[in-house]
Design a protein with these regions (language model features):
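Conserved N-proximal alpha/beta basic substrate-recognition cap immediately N-terminal to
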Residues: 1-42
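Phosphate-binding site of ATP-dependent enzymes
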Residues: 38-52, 57-60, 66-156
Length: 156
């Protein structure tokens, strides 16, 4: 349940920034693969720019916003609207976290209804300290939600 809480990414990133908790090889991995992530209380100290705002217990793109930070204010830049909002099983979230907004590359992918352009999201699943699986979702939208397709991967 800890890993389902998105603020876990903020914790890992905050510990990474201290340069005291993780080894150098661990920090290199975090720097390469973890999008800079921040606790809600740290938002005012961040540089102006675009950030993703996520509820810490959010799922399937529910309640995700892209916000433009200017000073201590956050203006809505883009919002994710999901189909069947009330059918998405997730805990109620009163807290949010932030991540740097990274513009994604677009890909063309063939799905059951034809060819679509969209974005890929890669995920790694862990069992203990071992990577156990890799997953990929394709979405015609930049923020993947319930419309995303699971994409088979081949390791050759």
């Amino acid at each position: 349940i800890i890993l389902q809480n998105k603020s876990f990414m903020s914790l890992v990133y905050a510990l990474y920034l201290t340069e005291q908790f993780f080894t150098k090889p661990d920090r290199d991995i975090i720097e390469r693969y973890l999008v800079p992530s921040y606790f809600e209380n740290d938002f005012s100290a961040l540089d102006d720019g675009l950030y993703i705002q996520k509820e810490i217990w959010g799922r399937e793109g529910r309640n995700i916003q892209v916000v433009q930070k200017r000073g201590n204010q956050a203006e809505l830049y883009m919002e994710k609207f999901v189909d069947n909002y009330d059918d998405i099983v997730c805990r109620d979230s009163k807290k949010v976290m932030y991540q740097d907004f990274i513009k994604q590359k677009h890909f063309t992918h063939t799905v059951d209804s034809g060819t679509k352009e969209g974005c890929l999201t890669l995920s790694c699943f862990m069992l203990g300290d071992q990577a156990s699986a890799v997953g990929c979702r394709f979405s015609p939208e930049e923020i993947a939600g319930t419309e995303a397709y699971f994409v088979p991967l081949l390791v050759d």
